[in-house]
């Protein structure tokens, strides 16, 4: 989702948890630890599962993935630059099974009901039409499949609101509101979605409803 200097800064920062937690508190007024804690889900999936990671960025969500883990992991991003970084990260972690793909969150090149777990970190707030991306994510999830991701929200600290205003003047989209994100998730079949904590960066998670017989 990022490219050029913004991508470089983002990737450098997000890979350094202590730095990102300090920056999150001081600059954005948010607790970044919730993002890193949510990524532990990848280490708990069952053998044979399919994981879609979109946008994968530089591969930050690989951190809990084990080299011997028997899963199909597809890391996708719209940015070739980010995918190159993700490939390097996979090599550094000896993750030889990770597959890579160029993909737009608003039109994912994956089959219906393909994923047991869908990861989506810090992508929705970079889109002009995040609702469309949520619809695509739900389409790709199997019934009972799990969604875990993060997004900046329109609500937040005074620091965050000020930075959102600066970003808007530079052409960045306004992040979704908590209410709209919950509405989109529910409308696309994510049962009782959780959006926590009550701050400007939230982890959203939930399971796709099972198909009725």
What are these model-predicted stretches?
Residues 1-45, 64, 148-170:
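Conserved class I S-adenosyl-L-methionine
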Residues 50-107:
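Class I SAM-dependent methyltransferase SAM/SAH-binding core
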Residues 106-117:
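A short acidic, Gly/Pro-enriched loop at the edge of an enzyme's catalytic core
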Residues 117-129:
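A short SAM/SAH-binding and catalytic strip from SAM-dependent methyltransferases
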Residues 131-143:
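A short glycine-rich, Lys/Arg-flanked "PGG" loop and its adjoining helix->strand segment in the class I
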Residues 173-188:
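Short alpha-helix
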Residues 189-213:
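Core SAM-dependent methyltransferase catalytic element
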């Amino acid at each position: 989702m990022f490219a050029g200097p913004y991508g470089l800064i983002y990737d450098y920062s997000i890979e350094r948890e202590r730095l990102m937690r300090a920056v999150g508190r001081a600059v954005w007024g948010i607790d970044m630890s919730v993002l890193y804690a949510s990524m532990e889900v990848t280490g708990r999936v069952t053998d044979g599962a399919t994981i879609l990671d979109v946008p994968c960025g530089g591969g930050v969500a690989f951190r809990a993935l084990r080299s011997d883990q028997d899963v199909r992991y597809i890391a996708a991003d719209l940015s070739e630059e980010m995918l190159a970084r993700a490939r390097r990260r996979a090599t550094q972690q000896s993750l030889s099974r990770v597959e890579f793909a160029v993909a737009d969150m608003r039109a994912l090149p994956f089959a219906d009901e393909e994923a047991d777990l869908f990861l989506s970190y810090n992508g929705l707030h970079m889109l002009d039409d995040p609702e469309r991306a949520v619809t695509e994510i739900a389409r790709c999830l199997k019934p009972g499949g799990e969604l875990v991701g993060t997004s900046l929200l329109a609500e937040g600290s005074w620091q965050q609101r000020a930075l959102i205003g600066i970003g808007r003047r530079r052409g960045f989209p306004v992040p979704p509101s908590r209410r709209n994100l919950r509405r989109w998730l529910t409308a696309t079949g994510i049962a009782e979605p959780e959006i926590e904590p009550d701050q400007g960066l939230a982890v959203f998670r939930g399971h796709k409803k099972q198909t009725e017989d």
